[in-house]
């Protein structure tokens, strides 16, 4: 049974940790599963990621960010996500189109309809079956990053991160059946348990 699951949220909320935990769980059950991430997930996409997150030589406008994220996305979908789904796998993706809408739309202030249009073109209209939103206060989440050097997005001010968080809230409220909102301040084990329960229900597995 093919299934497309995405993880969303602000910086440091634990998306990578929980997406990996879900991947390990599904593989242990013997299910075909592919774990990937945005931006990046392919060699070409990883080059775009480095430009988006670490470029200090040139100014990258919000519109340029929008196109770069979606260029990376289109490559990932064509080379990883769609083939895996067609083969009947469960695909888990750390970030997807909702992040672009939250960051470049609500965070950067681009017209929301423009962001949605470009997202739709790049994704071919592919919508996740389940989106897990790990919600957390942005200040507390960024503290989790520790002493690692911040990238362009982590370096943004608190106002930006709050707009992104609010944006995720609006997006989730518009599609309540697709979203599972979880308090990311819960323990890792508690979050993993909640996620497993929802995924088991989708796959019609015993709880």
UniProtKB/Swiss-Prot annotation:
Catalysed transformations (reactions): dTMP + ATP = dTDP + ADP
Task performed by this protein: Phosphorylation of dTMP to form dTDP in both de novo and salvage pathways of dTTP synthesis.
Molecular function, one GO term: dTMP kinase activity
One matching Pfam family: Thymidylate_kin
Binding site for ATP: 9-16
Protein name in the entry: Thymidylate kinase
InterPro entries: P-loop_NTPase (IPR027417), Thymidylate_kin-like_dom (IPR039430), Thymidylate_kin_CS (IPR018095), Thymidylate_kinase (IPR018094)
Family: Belongs to the thymidylate kinase family.
GO annotations of cellular component type: cytosol
Recorded coiled-coil stretches: none
Superkingdom to which the source organism belongs: Bacteria
Keyword field: ATP-binding, Kinase, Nucleotide biosynthesis, Nucleotide-binding, Transferase
PANTHER family: THYMIDYLATE KINASE (PTHR10344), UMP-CMP KINASE 2, MITOCHONDRIAL (PTHR10344:SF4)
SUPFAM superfamilies with a match to the protein in the record: P-loop containing nucleoside triphosphate hydrolases (SSF52540)
Organism: Dehalococcoides mccartyi (strain ATCC BAA-2266 / KCTC 15142 / 195)
EC number: 2.7.4.9
CDD domains, per database record: TMPK
GO biological process, alphabetically ordered: dTDP biosynthetic process; dTTP biosynthetic process; dUDP biosynthetic process
PROSITE patterns associated with the record: THYMIDYLATE_KINASE
């Amino acid at each position: 049974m093919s299934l497309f699951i995405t993880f969303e949220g602000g910086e440091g909320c634990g998306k990578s940790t929980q997406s990996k935990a879900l991947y390990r769980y599904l593989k242990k059950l013997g299910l075909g599963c592919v774990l990937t991430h945005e931006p990046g997930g392919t060699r070409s996409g990883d080059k775009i990621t480095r430009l988006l997150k670490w470029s200090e030589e040139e100014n990258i406008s919000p519109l340029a960010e929008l196109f770069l994220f979606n260029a990376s996305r289109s490559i990932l979908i064509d080379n990883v996500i769609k083939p895996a789904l067609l083969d009947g796998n469960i695909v888990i993706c750390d970030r997807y189109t909702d992040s672009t809408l939250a960051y470049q739309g609500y965070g950067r202030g681009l017209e929301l309809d423009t962001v949605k249009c470009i997202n739709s073109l790049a994704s071919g209209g592919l919508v996740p079956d389940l989106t897990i939103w790990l919600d957390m206060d942005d200040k507390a989440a960024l503290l989790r990053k520790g002493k690692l050097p911040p990238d362009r997005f982590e370096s943004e001010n608190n106002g930006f991160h709050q707009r992104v968080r609010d944006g995720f809230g609006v997006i989730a409220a518009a599609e309540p059946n697709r979203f599972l909102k979880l308090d990311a301040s819960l323990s890792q084990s508690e979050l993993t348990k909640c996620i497993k329960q929802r995924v088991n229900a989708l796959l019609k597995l015993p709880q």
